[in-house]
Amino acid sequence: TKIAGGVGIFLLVFLVPFADEIAGRIYFNHLCATEAGVKVYQTVELPTEYWETDGKPKFFNKHGYLEHNFWVKELDESGARVVRHSSIFAIDKRISPVKERSSQKVLAEVTTFLYWGGWMRRNLSPHNTASSCKFTEGPSFSRSFYSQLFKPAASAK
């Protein structure tokens, strides 16, 4: 009976307060793996000035990110929508459109999820920030994503 009591106290003190954190993290990781990602609806053809002679794009900086001036001239990434995906687990869904600046046509959408943590983290942490799906982090995402959006114009090939 001492063992059963000890297990009961363990469950009450540790498992119950953190159960929603554990289940929420599992669900969040599932959403990131199955529903988050990029949808490209339309590509943009760019003239020869944007391409090296070997066909590589000139619009990435040395760190692998899109050049700021190119981004400002060609794209509008405003208008992201955030909706509550799961109230039980405090998970939001963020859909970010990528539009051609001149026409405002939606070229692509990036969908990710934000996890705000379990009850204890949300209510007891003074500076709670959300975790987001990791696929959008770093220059490899930037290079891969924007390389899907832009291609050489027929005359540039």
Residue ranges, per PLM feature:
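N-terminal export/targeting and maturation segments
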Residues: 5-68
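Extracytosolic and intramembrane catalytic regions of membrane-associated proteins
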Residues: 42-157
